[in-house]
C-alpha cells in the first residue's frame, strides 16, 4: 500500500469492499477485483480468517446431507458469522479512513459499494445496514438473512447460479450426487431471495447465470479447471459477470451512467 500510486487527476475514487465466502480467502475473486479497480475504483478485499470451529460449528454440521440438517447449518452460519464479519468491515473502514493510511485522501468514503460471494454476499447486504451506508450492494449466490429483508434500502444486484428446477439428469451431470437434496436446499435459500425482491420495486435486479455453479462466481475454475461446472463457459461467464457488475457499480457510484440489462442466451433476468 505504501508504494501504491494514484493519479491526482483521478480525484477521490469510489470504494468497493469485497467479502469472500466461507472457507475461502480474499484472493478468490482477484480477476474481477482487478477489473473493477481498472475502471476507477478503490478496492478493499477483507480476509476473514474463517473457520467453522471459531463459530462453534463442525465439518459434520456442514456435511450432514439431509434437507433439515442443511437448512439448520445455513441458518447457524448466517446467524453466527455474519455479525462478526460486518464488525470486521466497520473496523477496516475505520482503519483506512485514518490520516495515517497512505491512500485515505484518494477515497470517497461517501461513495461505497459492498460486493460479496456466498457467505460474503450475505455479509455485504448486512453491512449495508450496519456499516457505512452503501450506494450499491452485490450478492453473488449467497443466502439472504431473513432479518434484513425489509431493511435493505440500497440498490441491489443479486447473481444466482443454475436453477434448482432443472431435471435430475442435468443436475447430476453437474456433479450433484443427490439432485433432490440440492433442489430442496437451494429452493429454501432462494425463498428469502424471492421475498426480498417481492418487497422491492425499484433499483433491485436479479440475474441468473443459467449454467454456472456456485464456485463459478470465483476464480477457482481458472486455477483448478476440474472445478468448472459442466456446461459452463468460464471465459464467457467471467466476461459477462464482470460487465454486469461494473455497469451496475457505474450506474450507482458514478455520475452520467445508467444500468442496462445485458442480454445473452446464457443469462436469465428474473427481475
Name the predicted role of every residue range.
Residues 27-69, 210:
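Active-site machinery of serine-nucleophile hydrolases
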Residues 50, 56-109:
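Alpha/beta-hydrolase active-site loop
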